[in-house]
Amino acid sequence: VLSPADKSNVKAAWGKVGGHAGDYGAEALERMFLSFPTTKTYFPHFDLSHGSAQVKGHGKKVADALTNAVALVDDMPNALSALSDLHAHKLRVDPVNFKLLSHCLLVTLAAHHPADFTPAVHASLDKFLASVSTVLTSKYR
């Protein structure tokens, strides 16, 4: 459960992402594909090379979903319901992959905003991304 301090940290950190959200989403996906090659199996139709338009497009979708989750942090189950259905029933993404992408997002954010990535912010973002992952996997049961 996110505390009021966690929610404040997440909103402040995501606010600093600003117009770079799509770029950071794409960078996190590239990082995930390089670090965890098995995740590529969900994207057989994508050009997974550095800077590909498909990875950038999906990175923007990821970032937009996270922006929505930040904005509706107190109602994430409703905010992410359609994505949960999509990933559970149509795409059938293994839930562990959400943890892998979350880790890559944290690394990406830390690389771009090292001064802002304090231990407290890191912990809050980690809890937030874990909450997002929990919501996205809730319809698997």
UniProtKB/Swiss-Prot annotation:
Residues 1-141 form the Globin domain. The modification Phosphoserine is found at S3, S35, S49, S102, S124, S131, S138. The modification Phosphothreonine is found at T108, T134, T137. Red blood cells. It comes from the Eukaryota. Keywords: Acetylation, Heme, Iron, Metal-binding, Oxygen transport, Phosphoprotein, Transport. O2 binds at H58. The modification Phosphotyrosine is found at Y24. The modification N6-succinyllysine is found at K7, K11, K16, K40. GO terms for biological process: hydrogen peroxide catabolic process. GO terms for cellular component: blood microparticle; haptoglobin-hemoglobin complex; hemoglobin complex. GO terms for molecular function: haptoglobin binding; heme binding; iron ion binding; organic acid binding; oxygen binding; oxygen carrier activity; peroxidase activity. Heterotetramer of two alpha chains and two beta chains. PANTHER family: HEMOGLOBIN FAMILY MEMBER, HEMOGLOBIN SUBUNIT ALPHA. This is Hemoglobin subunit alpha. It comes from Saguinus mystax.
